Amino acid sequence: MARLRLAIKKDKALRFLSHLDFARAVRYVVIRADLPVQYSEGFNPHMKIAFASALGVGVAAAEEYMDIELAETVDVEDVKRRMNEKAPEGFAVLEGRYVSDKAPKLMAIANYAEYLLSGPLTESIEEDVINRRLDVFNKAEEAVYEKYSPKTRKTRCINVKDHVLEPITAQIDGSDIHLRVRIYQNESGAVKPSQVWELLARQFDIPVDPTLMLAERTGLWSRQKGENRTLFEMP
């Protein structure tokens, strides 16, 4: 058995697929590429494929990772070629590397992500004004997002600053704004990109519709002791 770690992308053409639909599409690619993938045992066998995260509907990813267990070693470049030849528009294998079967699961180590959040401005504004408002957030020790759960009928308060460890930056492109934000997932969980966007709109006067935003994840790492490592670097 060989465990192959792949860096892949879920481009804009697939951004509105749910995670389950995206995973199903990837399984079809693996089948069509005729790879010797391993299956679980039992009454309902399934491919031994695992993703680093479950991307939300509407979120594209220039960088995502998946592990696939193969019955035998196949040349990485051959896997890449075969999968890309059978891939739908919006999906591609970028690179790959074999890892130890004792390596930690991707979901256990992928805890730091960079996103590009984009949406239309609701008013004309200079970039330096945006940056001054963002500076207030960047220097704040606390920025609380209130998350209401209809299921429990309770409101949970999340200090977004526990998860946004680096300054958010902005770029204005015509009537649109692009925010670059890095989000850390700690023991208590993480915040969603949409929640950061909403917080900035409602509490820090960033002139955007708090509900109108598209997100693209542009990087994914394992953050350990203040250092970011690629998921290929992990043992």
Please place each PLM-identified region on the residue numbering.
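Ordered, amphipathic secondary-structure segments that act as subunit-interaction surfaces
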Residues: A62-L116
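Ordered, soluble secondary-structure elements with a strong preference for glycine-centered loop motifs
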Residues: R15-L20, T73-D78, S124-D128, E187-V191
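Short, charge-patterned binding micro-sites
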Residues: Q38-L70
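Short amphipathic alpha-helices in soluble, non-transmembrane regions
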Residues: D78-A87, D128-A140, V196-W197
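Core RNA-modification/binding signature centered on pseudouridine synthases
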Residues: K139-P235
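Extended, well-folded interaction surfaces typified by the phenylalanyl-tRNA synthetase beta subunit core
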Residues: A2, A7-K9, A13, L17, ...
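Short beta-strand-to-loop capping motifs
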Residues: I8, I68-V74, L117-E123, V181-Q185
